[in-house]
Amino acid sequence: MKPFRNLAETRTPDGSRFSLHEHDGQYFLKLNGRQLMGSNSTVSEVLLADLACPPHQRREKPRVLIGGLGLGFSLRRVLELTGPKAIVEVAELLPEVVAWNREFLGGLNGPLLDDPRVEVFTGDVFDCISKGAAHYDAILLDVDNGPTSFVRRQNARLYKRNGVDLIWRSLKPGGRVAFWSAEREPAFQANLQRAGFRVDEVPAKAHERAKRAAHRIYVGLRQDS
């Protein structure tokens, strides 16, 4: 069996070890040795983009925010779905992840970060959401395991009522937010509904051949009365 190659690593703000690995042509991100995502299981990341940016609701010059760059699969799909006048902001907490995408992952998705539609913000996606009302047509959030299981405790504020209200205000009327979740979160779904979103819970497989949809994507549509 071919060994895992440790390509690069860094430390998160709380001191955890975050690393990029390659094995038999596939790439993986790990936190303290535990796999967070891999290029062999990207179905749910692509679905996240499909649900946030449905082609039938395409706008001429959409502004999209992606929370979490990861291996770049959600970004690639958003660029495929939006037109040439789109502005796609990517908020990534770790500058090293941005650098790894440029240095190691070009063979996966191409030079995504060189696309003129892409704007990279190195920092917390919460700061992007806080900067203005009715700013985004779509928001994709894949920054943690979901509303209750956190790798980074500070991400909890995105899923609490105040955070959800802030997301609602940052969307344009008719805008969508899509949250990736490792599992079902009915309490969070209710929280989105209380904030005024029309909510869909969408099952998501980790990979094409999976027998069941282990993950969930929660899609909130901003409806204005």
Predicted regions and their residues:
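The AdoMet/dcAdoMet-binding core of the Class I SAM-like
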Residues: 42, 46-171, 179-182, 190, ...
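N-terminal auxiliary segments of SAM/dcSAM-dependent transferases
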Residues: 1-30
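C-terminal lobe and adjacent flexible extensions of AdoMet/dcAdoMet transferase-like proteins
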Residues: 218-225
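Short amphipathic beta-strand/extended segments with alternating polar/hydrophobic composition
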Residues: 36-42
